[in-house]
Amino acid sequence: MSNAEHSSNFIRNIIIDDLDSKKHDTIITRFPPEPNGYLHIGHAKSIVLNFELGKEFNGRTNLRFDDTNPIKEDTEYVESIKEDVHWLGYNWSELHFASNYFDEMYKRALLLIKKGKAYVCDLTPEEIKEYRGTLTEPGKESPYRNRSVEENLDLFERMRKGEFEDGSKVLRAKIDMSSPNINFRDPIIYRIAHASHHNTGDKWCIYPMYDFAHPLEDAIEGITHSICTLEFADHRPLYDWFVKECEMENIPRQIEFARLNITNTVMSKRKLKQLVDEGIVDGWDDPRMPTVAGLRRRGYTPKSIRNFCKAIGVAKADSTVDYQMLEHFIREDLQETAPRAMAVINPLKLVITNYPEGKSEILEIENNPKDESAGKRAVTFSREIYIEREDFMENPPKKYFRLFPGNEVRLKGAYFVKCNEVIKDENGEVTEIHCTYDPETKSGTGFTGRKVKGTIHWVDANNCIPAEFRLYEPLILDDCEENEGKHFLEQINPNSLTICKGFIEPSAKDAKPQDKYQLFRHGYFNVDPNFTSDDNLVFNRIVSLKSSFKLK
């Protein structure tokens, strides 16, 4: 981290104070995802924050799966999360599952009952909600609140044995139904769920609630700084209450920071799952998705995501980050590393009528104009080439400097060509254009006889590779996740994906999935790992070449 990033990271300052005061000898942080979906860019921010803090202070960072809800969780998500954390460049100190602590949590729940701090409640979910009260009205005590310790122990044991139906009973903490903090109004700490668990199978039919389980997990693992997002700030007193009343030996500290919001991006796992389930996208790794898997398939690099997460900093108030900031960091990374190539994604044939038939020559084109050490690559040139259809207009507007009848342009790395004839089909659509070239104007010869204002790219029609190019726009039209109460599905961009069939120069013949290229004038592209095969080369556009965005 830079000094600016350090000074703005209030969590880092808390850790420094704790270490200086000898409150802790070392720090232990954790990343605790629930395995009920794929990680997204917001989770990446938490991953980077926790692991970088652990690394900076020579501490440890655990990966813990908060798997306390068997109905929504799956091993598919466990494996994808582990893959994503590794891909981002991090190795956890210890791997844990909350479900491995179920026995210990059960013992602590028994302790609360014995202390008169928990009771079994028979109210329905609707009644519990009604009894809870509101922000302006206190709650009402459950008629089951004053059951004896013995009765509560008996009922809780029978809950564990599976004698009761789902939803018929819960275990609640006995705190204060009139507390101004609604989270203190006798929160549920165990519910009945007759469902197989991905890790514990059918051993349990009662499962702890997040507010109860999470502080115990942190305490069991000796976590020193439990870092979470701002929506848990009101839960912190309850977090501390459970640690104290359950008589945990280690006392972790919960610290909240602002979650990541990005323009034109849905960050809710529930909504992302809806996009997948309803077929609006083609899976969790669709390149339009903000999931780590989607960003990886799109072509984002671990370095670009880490740098983005570090640059946005750690704040105490929610804000929204411009999506262009994320794009800035992938451009910055690939500008230095991506090999260059020419590709035509919407091809129009150009015939050079005065170029000898059957002739082919090899031209040398620089790989990176900003880096001479990158060298040059060989590209063939012949009588027939493809150019972009948008690089020709029969009746152009003013200040259009590309090809039109009578105009001359430079072909990148080759010659000047002038348009002399336009060929059309029976519908009046241009099918090819005929040009003449000037052999004296070859690039690299030092020709200065005249200048042209336009340079366009091309590929040799006799030596190129067919390819599919997938061009992406934001999946969400509006700048915020919810706009004036609109359902987010009403904001889906119908033009978020455009598929083009074109050609790329032969230097890409050995391209492998996840290889990245800068395609001249088009942007940065990634070879798609899902759709690419030996006879079908598919490129995802990661980002365009330029943006008006300026990093402050």
From Swiss-Prot:
ATP binds at residues 34-36, 40-46, 229, 259-260, 267-269. It is found in: Cytoplasm. Its EC number is 6.1.1.18. Keywords: Aminoacyl-tRNA synthetase, ATP-binding, Cytoplasm, Ligase, Nucleotide-binding, Protein biosynthesis. The keyword ATP-binding applies. It holds the Pfam family tRNA-synt_1c_C. This is Glutamine--tRNA ligase. It comes from Clostridium perfringens (strain SM101 / Type A).
